[in-house]
Amino acid sequence: MLPPPLLTLAVTNAAGGLNPDYHVGDIVVLNDHLNLAGLVGFHPLRGKNADDFGVRFPALSDAYDLGLRQKAHQAWAAMTSKASSRSLREGVYAFVAGPTYETRAECRMLHGLGADMVGMSTVPEIIVARHSGIKILALSLVTNNAVLQPVARGDDAALQSMTPEDMEAHLSKGKATHQEVLDAGREAAVDMQVSCHVRVVHSISADRNRLLWKRLFLGCDIPEARQQKAHLFLKLPERFALRAL
């Protein structure tokens, strides 16, 4: 097996909160995932295995490195005060293919399966990285709270007297929108892209690991992002990027 082109991969994403204890703006350190798409055949390692990168059947029981998760908690404790309104949590991420947001029944199912968050990214990259022996640190920003309550019933007598406008407002409560995801990302930009990222990266770099930091949050306020007017990506080395495709 060839040595990996990097030792550590840090990824971030925006996710819907399934855990009722989570709030919009909370940051969650991933410790496990549910790859729902992978269970039905949508898997990044399908096809002939590239033996130079890893084994045919890699184990994912320890996909999220414990040491890196500990460093993330230590860095957060060092940078936040008791008065901070943003919490750092640790939980399980459910990956779905999208692009639609989840139905209420799907949200209840995912939460019942043990997921704390749900999103449409990150897990394929993590699987490819772990296949190549790369350590993973993954962080989610909770950008909206998933709706777990059952949908309104057509025979609900309490709804019969509602005006169409009131009915629309009632049914729209908690509905996920892309705009609220963008807004939550912009609000968290300073914490996530400057303070937290810098401290965690410095903590990891102290171990002299080579680090790839993949930034997926929108609305970053640091100068480099404003100049590029785009997401920030530190490029994967060529052969790793080709394997990821």
Question: For the regions a protein language model found, what residue spans apply to each?
Answer:
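Glycine-rich phosphate- or other oxyanion-binding loops that anchor nucleotides, phosphorylated ligands
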Residues: M1-L148, K175-V201, W213, G219, ...
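Eukaryotic N-terminal low-complexity, Ser/Thr- and Lys/Arg-rich leader segments
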Residues: D155-M167, H202-R210, I222-L245
